[in-house]
């Protein structure tokens, strides 16, 4: 690979990162580490798990990122009574045709927000395993590929909170990053209060296409990483 050519491709493909960051900063006050982690997962094709108490803009950050990208987005609110079929889909009998037809679930989207994923029992959490690892879902006897790009962005509450279920190790391993979100700084909290009092709302419009993300990921895979950086 020609280094000069690769550098030029990186500059071209990374131009949208600044625009995404600017768009996120218009809505999210502070939380730089959160924004950076979401962008790393987006470019590295790795699922991201955000952990923090309610009210720290975890869900808002994910929704804002998805709104900045012209792609299909779905949100799954995990609750104790949720079923695996509510996540991946199921077979539905059609009286008209007298056959079973596939009804796809909300996991069939480019960006899937698994909100409060540890509010549901392990049986429901595991419904995402095949989708996250193999980018496909099996319903009945049929296997369906998921759209590209496919990214699961999940939020969870600290495990000591009431009504939470610990994520199985196999589920945790499917996430590339786990980001623990802390409270914003004092000045940031003051700014959040002022924005809420003034009713400031920023309209978020798509500035990026899904195909551009796929192309950027190809460039990321070409970046050379010496083994000393991850073995020392």
Model regions and ranges:
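Canonical AAA+ ATPase core
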Residues: 134-207, 215-222
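Walker A/P-loop
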Residues: 43-78
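Conserved alpha-helical scaffold flanking the Walker A/P-loop in AAA+ ATPase domains
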Residues: 94-112
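Short hinge/gating elements
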Residues: 2-7, 22, 110-114, 157-158, ...
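P-loop NTPase switch/communication element
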Residues: 84-99, 150-151
């Amino acid at each position: 690979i020609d280094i000069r050519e690769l550098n030029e491709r990186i500059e071209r493909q990374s131009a949208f990162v600044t625009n995404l960051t600017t768009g996120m900063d218009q809505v999210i006050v502070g939380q730089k580490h959160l924004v950076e982690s979401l962008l790393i997962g987006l470019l590295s094709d790795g699922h991201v798990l955000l952990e923090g108490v309610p009210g720290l803009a975890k869900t808002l950050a994910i929704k804002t990122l998805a709104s900045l990208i012209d792609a299909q987005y779905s949100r799954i609110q995990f609750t104790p009574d949720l079923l695996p079929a509510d996540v991946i889909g199921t077979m539905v009998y059609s009286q008209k045709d007298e056959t079973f037809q596939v009804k796809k679930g909300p996991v069939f989207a480019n960006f899937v927000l698994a909100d409060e994923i540890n509010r549901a029992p392990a049986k429901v959490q595991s419904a995402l395993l095949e989708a996250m690892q193999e980018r496909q879902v099996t319903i009945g006897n049929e296997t369906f590929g998921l759209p590209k790009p496919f990214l699961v962005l999940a939020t969870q509450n600290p495990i000591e909170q009431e009504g939470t279920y610990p994520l199985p190790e196999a589920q945790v391993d499917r996430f590339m990053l786990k980001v623990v979100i802390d409270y914003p700084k004092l000045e940031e909290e003051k700014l959040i209060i002022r924005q809420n009092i003034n009713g400031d709302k920023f309209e978020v419009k798509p500035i990026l296409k899904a195909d551009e993300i796929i192309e950027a990921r190809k460039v990321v895979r070409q970046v050379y990483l010496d083994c000393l950086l991850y073995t020392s």
